[in-house]
């Protein structure tokens, strides 16, 4: 028995308890623990227990005003509602999943757990199954260099996907690095930059509209926030995916895109440019089988021109199978207030049925009412000159009833004001 093992155990236990934050409780640098036999097993159990109790993804809220991390509970609820346990995606080993806007790996961690369960009968060997899921099914584009590291930590337990078991303070990839032969794995570290035209003559980025003089273009800044997924021309995607993933077509696209690019005019987001709609539009253009995203709900009712393309695209193809709308953003992001609420949806290619619309109303974070109905997402109004979304079924019912009354009927039932005059 190692004479230092008991001391190591006590030291590690005290260390984790005193720093129940990020570095020691969830980094999972278990290679630094040299205990053997029963003592090593106890250490492993302690580490796993502490990692679960102090989940890294529950400790970090967000790293900036523009990027809102998805809470673990919200991610789990979104997956459970949009892709129930009996959904085909959990038992199909041939599907390719893409998160084009990964911030911390929460979606793919939860997805990997569900795939591991759903593929048990198809790939009985646990090692082969997990290897297949990690190397052949899940593909991610980090939003920034920092978030790319977080994603690898979450998925591979290591910032370097080919890192083998070591005594260095860098953890280890799943199965000691046997999954990948490169340090990135299936997580791309973003490398695109804002484009201001030939000779940089334009004032704004061609792709996202960022001003040339904004903080995002500062040459001294490590992060450029030129998100790869929306900084590619339409003819560049195939080569980008082939180069980085060896895959050119994705079956399921899922994620929580950055909502805006702040221009510094206000901490509440006033004056900031919304960009989440660009991620949705680009994803639809790739024609996956399924698309699921959680985004601000204001695109449904806002008169801003930047949302017109998204509404027009969705009106045209009618492929949204289900959408969940939350008037209070705190139902999904307890520590954030997002004006206009939040929604998450599942878009299914070539789906032509009605949309299941679930609308949740809350007061002070407590659920008060859920309105659920299957109906057309877009409703024609004003003699079919416009199409709008009624987020509550009763609003649509009231409009339909009023609209069904002809002008003559209105005249016959209308009481003249003059008869009440003296």
Curated annotation (Swiss-Prot):
Keywords: Methyltransferase, S-adenosyl-L-methionine, Transferase
Chemical reaction(s) catalysed: a 2'-deoxyadenosine in DNA + S-adenosyl-L-methionine = an N(6)-methyl-2'-deoxyadenosine in DNA + S-adenosyl-L-homocysteine + H(+)
Top-level enzyme category: transferase
Tagged with keyword S-adenosyl-L-methionine: yes
GO molecular function, one term: site-specific DNA-methyltransferase (adenine-specific) activity
One GO biological process term: methylation
E.C. number(s) listed in UniProt: 2.1.1.72
InterPro entries registered for this protein in UniProt: DNA_methylase_N6_adenine_CS (IPR002052), MethylTrfase_TaqI-like_dom (IPR011639), SAM-dependent_MTases_sf (IPR029063)
Pfam family, one: Eco57I
Domain of life of the native organism: Bacteria
Family named by the database record: Belongs to the N(4)/N(6)-methyltransferase family.
Protein name: Uncharacterized adenine-specific methylase MPN_111
Organism: Mycoplasma pneumoniae (strain ATCC 29342 / M129 / Subtype 1) (Mycoplasmoides pneumoniae)
């Amino acid at each position: 028995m190692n004479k230092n093992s008991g001391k190591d155990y006590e030291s590690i236990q005290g260390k984790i308890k005193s720093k129940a934050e990020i570095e020691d409780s969830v980094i999972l640098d278990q290679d630094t623990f040299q205990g053997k036999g029963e003592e090593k097993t106890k250490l492993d159990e302690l580490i796993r227990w502490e990692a679960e109790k102090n989940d890294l993804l529950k400790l970090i809220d967000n790293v900036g005003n523009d990027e809102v991390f998805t809470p673990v509970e919200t991610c789990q609820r979104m997956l459970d509602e949009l892709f129930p346990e009996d959904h085909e995606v959990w038992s199909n080993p041939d599907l390719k999943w893409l998160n084009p806007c990964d911030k911390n790996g929460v979606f793919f961690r939860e997805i990997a757990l569900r795939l591991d369960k759903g593929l048990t009968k198809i790939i009985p060997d646990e090692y082969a199954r997990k290897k297949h899921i990690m190397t052949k099914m899940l593909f991610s584009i980090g939003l920034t260099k920092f978030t790319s590291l977080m994603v690898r930590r979450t998925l591979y337990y290591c910032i370097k996907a080919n890192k083998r078991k070591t005594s260095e303070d860098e953890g280890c990839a799943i199965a000691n690095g046997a999954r990948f032969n490169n340090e990135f794995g299936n997580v791309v570290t973003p490398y695109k930059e804002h484009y201001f035209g030939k000779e940089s003559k334009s004032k704004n980025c061609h792709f996202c509209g960022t001003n040339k003089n904004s903080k995002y273009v500062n040459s001294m800044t490590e992060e450029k926030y030129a998100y790869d997924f929306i900084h590619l021309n339409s003819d560049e995607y195939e080569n980008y995916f082939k180069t980085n993933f060896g895959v050119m077509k994705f079956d399921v696209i899922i994620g929580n895109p950055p909502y805006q690019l702040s221009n510094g005019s206000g901490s509440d987001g006033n004056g900031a440019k919304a960009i989440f709609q660009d991620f949705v539009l680009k994803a639809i253009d790739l024609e996956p089988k399924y698309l699921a995203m959680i985004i601000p709900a204001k695109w449904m009712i806002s008169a801003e021109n930047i949302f017109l393309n998204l509404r027009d695209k969705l009106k045209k193809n009618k492929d949204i199978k289900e959408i969940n709308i939350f008037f209070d953003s705190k139902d999904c992001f307890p520590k954030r207030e997002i004006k206009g609420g939040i929604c998450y949806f599942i878009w299914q290619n070539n789906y032509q049925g009605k949309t299941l619309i679930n609308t949740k109303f809350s007061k002070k974070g407590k659920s008060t009412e859920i309105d659920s109905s299957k109906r057309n997402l877009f409703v024609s109004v004003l003699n079919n000159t416009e199409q709008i979304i009624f987020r509550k079924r009763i609003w649509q019912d009231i409009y339909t009833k009023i609209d069904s009354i002809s002008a003559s009927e209105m005249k016959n039932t209308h009481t003249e004001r003059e008869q009440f005059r003296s």
